[in-house]
From Swiss-Prot:
Glycans are attached at N167, N235, N247, N566. Residues 1-20 form the signal peptide. Disulfide bonds join C445-C491. This is Fructan 1-exohydrolase. It comes from Aegilops speltoides. Inhibited by sucrose. It catalyses: Hydrolysis of terminal, non-reducing (2->1)-linked beta-D-fructofuranose residues in fructans.
Length: 595
């Protein structure tokens, strides 16, 4: 469960929206951050059934997953079952602010177009009356899906609960029944914190034939992926040691644990036999981002052992370097792949969200796999998203000298998919790399912006640009030379993305290693979907999700996309392809689907 206190600001002024409608009632409780250990904020009781104003559509995405209205956060329990993809998610039925969380539920056959159903889980038992928080789905032998999720009781104590589909012959699995013995797991062991015990993983079977599952928790004041065993998935016993723990933080949210094969983008099902040579990834949501480690699952010790132990978690690898949190992966048996997606929060203000009538979205589903060198995960948008492409344009053989700006015309700059390869004629001019930059790549992106010339770079894309460039977002690369390798910095700079002063407008960034002596091309793919921008650099080595709110979105046909180079070295573009993206059908029904 991604706790909203980590992101939201106090609701101080609600503006004209509230003035014209009503004054909401505010509540304060520990889950809203009033427990002394978290930042305090107010959770608003939003209008039950408002019609969002027309301006709400200005920033609303066309092909990202989000409900028709109201607040959403973490993906919870995605799965593929009997020909249908299911996306469960944290959802507030009552308004566009955090609170009253239930499990929203949508289904799809292609991961692009979604039908919205009634909530799968609502707050109606003592063990989840304060919220049906994040969890997972595991498919048991015989094709029996089972939900395990975190619930909060009236005192905000957290425990794990189970639910089963009422009718497995229903292709959409609309109704779920909670187990009579809920909660099945309580934080009653010595050293555990009862309000920091949440987000169970998908289960897997160990060599002894017993089910295992990890739960994010605080143990003796430090973070841990707590490990549990079960014969039947109903009765669980805590293992005397965690799957993995770290004493540098006190809570890991939304842990995810899965197997990967180096250099193979085929997915692996944890409940099946894991092939020789496989690695494991342990992901955790911490410090407002999703980080991960690559290692092995030691069957003898029943523990995760990272390949490299890095004490400073600022140096841990990230799933995404932007506005991306609480990600969840699942094994897609339909196409033998592992898919991951995460929550991208709004970076405007809570009063803006009330005015829009909605808040939050999920990133485009991504295939995720392990690079051939076994050092990092790679990600790429699922191929199904390409079904929305239309109006393709292509350019080959471009040369970008220092200061050049090439406009990519004839695509909808609000909804576009752009793929571009940059080729370096020479790498001799690369500036020297400072290893201290790895501690804070965002700071370096801010200090060395797209207008600051370097030896090689910056070069990349300018997107959502107004006519006079007073609003624009830059996604670009810089190339550096260290003693033994080349390092590429990828940035998504939002500082001039909007004229509005009341927004979060950082310069996101991440580094990746690249063997430029063998391969001189660096690829960039950017998907633009109004207020959501997702960029994939170096074949998915660095991914950055950004949220932007430019005024230019109000002027149809007035935004621009450019390729640029501000570095001293000339950059070639052997291939540039761009498409307008059609609108997907995403939870468009008014009310719940009646099918």
């Amino acid at each position: 469960m991604a706790q909203a206190w980590a992101f939201l600001l106090p609701l101080l002024v609600l503006g004209s929206y509230v003035t014209s409608l009503f004054f909401p009632t505010y509540i304060s409780n520990p889950l809203c951050g009033g427990d002394g250990g978290r930042s305090f904020h107010l959770c608003a009781q939003a209008p039950k059934d408002p019609d969002p104003p027309a301006v709400s559509t200005m920033y609303k995405t066309a092909f990202h997953f989000q409900p028709a209205k109201n607040w959403m956060n973490d993906p919870s329990g995605p799965m593929y079952f009997n020909g249908i993809y299911h996306e469960f998610y944290q959802y507030n039925l009552n308004g566009p602010i955090f609170g009253d969380i239930v499990w929203g539920h949508s289904v799809s056959t292609d991961l692009v177009n979604w039908i919205g159903l009634e909530p799968a889980l609502v707050r109606d038992t003592p063990s989840d009356i304060d919220g049906c928080w994040t969890g997972s789905v595991t498919i048991l032998p015989g094709g029996k899906p089972i939900i395990i999720y975190t619930g909060g009781d009236i005192d905000q104590n957290q425990a794990q609960n189970i639910a089963f589909p009422k009718n497995r012959s229903d292709p959409y699995l609309r109704e779920w029944i909670k187990a009579d013995n809920n909660p099945v797991l309580r934080p009653d062991e010595p050293g555990m914190n009862s309000i920091e015990f949440r987000d169970p993983t998908t289960g897997w079977i160990g060599p002894d034939g017993l089910w295992r599952m990890a739960v994010g928790g605080e143990l003796n004041g430090y973070s841990a992926a707590l490990l549990y065993k079960s014969e039947d998935f109903l009765n669980w016993t805590k293992v005397d040691h965690p799957l993995y723990s770290h004493n540098g933080s006190n809570m890991w949210e939304c842990p995810d644990f899965f197997a990967v094969l180096p250099g193979n983008n085929a997915g692996l099902d944890l409940s099946a036999a894991i092939p020789q040579g496989a690695k494991h990834a342990l992901k955790m949501s911490v410090d407002s981002v999703d980080k991960y480690m690559i290692g092995v699952y030691d069957l003898q010790r029943d523990a995760f052992v990272p390949d490299n132990v890095v004490d400073d978690r600022r140096l841990w690898l990230r799933i995404d370097y932007g506005t991306f949190y609480a990600s969840k992966s699942f094994f897609d048996s339909n196409k033998n792949r592992r898919i991951i997606w995460g929550w991208s929060r709004e970076t405007d203000s809570p009063s803006d969200d009330l005015a829009k009538g909605w808040a939050g979205l999920h990133t485009i589903p991504r295939t995720i796999w392990l690079a051939g060198d076994g050092k990092q995960l790679l990600q790429w948008p699922v191929e199904e998203i390409e079904s929305l492409r239309t109006n393709e344009i292509n350019h080959q053989g471009l040369e970008l000298n220092k200061g050049d700006l090439f406009e990519i015309k004839e695509v909808d700059a609000f909804q576009a998919d752009v793929e571009i390869d940059f080729e370096l004629a020479s790498i001799d001019d690369a500036d020297r790399f400072d290893p201290s930059w790895l501690l804070d790549p965002e700071k370096h992106c801010g200090e060395a912006g797209a207008s600051v010339p370097g030896g090689i770079g910056p070069f990349g894309l300018v997107i959502l640009a107004s006519d006079n460039m007073d609003e624009h977002t830059e996604v670009y690369f810089r190339v550096y030379k260290s003693e033994e390798k080349y390092m590429v910095l990828m940035c998504s700079d939002l500082r001039r993305s909007s004229l509005r002063p009341d927004l979060e407008k950082p310069a996101y960034g991440g580094f990746f290693e690249f063997d430029l002596e063998k391969e001189r091309k660096i690829s960039l793919r950017t998907l633009i979907d109004r207020s959501a921008v997702e960029s994939f650099g170096g074949g998915g080595r660095v991914c950055i999700t950004s949220r932007v709110y430019p005024a230019v979105l109000a002027d149809v046909g007035r935004a621009h996309i450019y390729a640029f180079n501000n570095g001293s070295a000339t950059v070639s573009v052997p291939q540039l392809s761009a498409w307008t993206m059609r609108k997907a059908q995403v939870n468009v029904e008014k009310g719940w689907s009646a099918i």
